[in-house]
UniProtKB/Swiss-Prot annotation:
One GO BP annotation of this record: mitochondrial electron transport, ubiquinol to cytochrome c
Binding site for heme b b566: H97, H196
Protein name: Cytochrome b
Native organism: Ovis dalli (Dall's sheep)
Compartments where located: Mitochondrion inner membrane
Anything else known: Heme 1 (or BL or b562) is low-potential and absorbs at about 562 nm, and heme 2 (or BH or b566) is high-potential and absorbs at about 566 nm.
Gene: MT-CYB
Keywords for this protein: Electron transport, Heme, Iron, Membrane, Metal-binding, Mitochondrion, Mitochondrion inner membrane, Respiratory chain, Transmembrane, Transmembrane helix, Transport, Ubiquinone
Molecular function terms from GO: metal ion binding; ubiquinol-cytochrome-c reductase activity
Family: Belongs to the cytochrome b family.
CDD domains per UniProt: cytochrome_b_C, Cytochrome_b_N
Residues that span the membrane, as ranges: 33-53, 77-98, 113-133, 178-198, 226-246, 288-308, 320-340, 347-367
SUPFAM superfamilies hit by this protein: a domain/subunit of cytochrome bc1 complex (Ubiquinol-cytochrome c reductase), Transmembrane di-heme cytochromes
Keyword flag Electron transport: yes
Amino acid sequence: MTNIRKTHPLMKIVNNAFIDLPAPSNISSWWNFGSLLGICLILQILTGLFLAMHYTPDTTTAFSSVTHICRDVNYGWIIRYMHANGASMFFICLFMHVGRGLYYGSYTFLETWNIGVILLFATMATAFMGYVLPWGQMSFWGATVITNLLSAIPYIGTNLVEWIWGGFSVDKATLTRFFAFHFIFPFMIAALAMVHLLFLHETGSNNPTGIPSDTDKIPFHPYYTIKDILGAILLILVLMLLVLFTPDLLGDPDNYTPANPLNTPPHIKPEWYFLFAYAILRSIPNKLGGVLALILSILVLVIMPLLHTSKQRSMMFRPISQCMFWILVADLLTLTWIGGQPVEHPYIIIGQLASIMYFLIILVMMPVASIIENNLLKW
């Protein structure tokens, strides 16, 4: 009798995706982040569900309902901090996952890559709306500043902003709709992630060499299931270290002050994982220009396959491109640092230079480095 996992309509899908899936024999730990993102998403949905049971999306009670969760609900504090720090872990895994894709040329799987970019945008939108929900000072002013950016759109901008707000300022209507969207988006992300996986399994995984591995495949289970479990243990270890020892390390102290429309905080800044994009936004003196640069800083990922001028897929055997890649990483870290600093000298000029460098490396230096390497191969 054939095994049920190979015949049952539902089990067959699971089997082909996680058990009998042919995987390259040489994929490194950089390939762990996909499964870690899945774990993060499940964790966020579960903790979020339990938080939603006690949260009230109303301007008068939102802040106190979060306090109530932390003080009065059984293990509410751990659920709240797992959700808040889980978002940070989610973005760490996301950045690693995207970085891996850039380094090893995984963006040549066009459909998988483009859905990945959509997933990145959806996750960023979800995180932004979630940050508004506790209704602290940074929640309110973050929502005001970021939604206000849409007013830079010519002609329809102002109407669009007021439509999103549901009034003439960030208020009760805004909070209620953000809660509704924050609840539904993760399920859309889960659906998109399944499509992401579907397209990936059409081609099979890439590997560090970038060379087709059809001649050397191994079953996903037990080899990569055990490897993914190790990754998951480390992820949960780091998350719980954050939650139990320094739960507020990555948060903003201003968010422990209830939202007050009459009092602007001295430094309005988003969560750490948006600081690089925020720095790019602030580095352009023009409002519309800044908004475009902000969107393009992420959207540039879509054209990565067009910018691939190398004859090799991966950067494994391309030292000049490797150099460019790590300069880009350093540049992103610089932008992240600048995004958290006040708008004054010397931070303004550093931010502007880092922003120019960001686009210059991706659009010019990396493709040129690839062409140089192609020519070096002829020698």
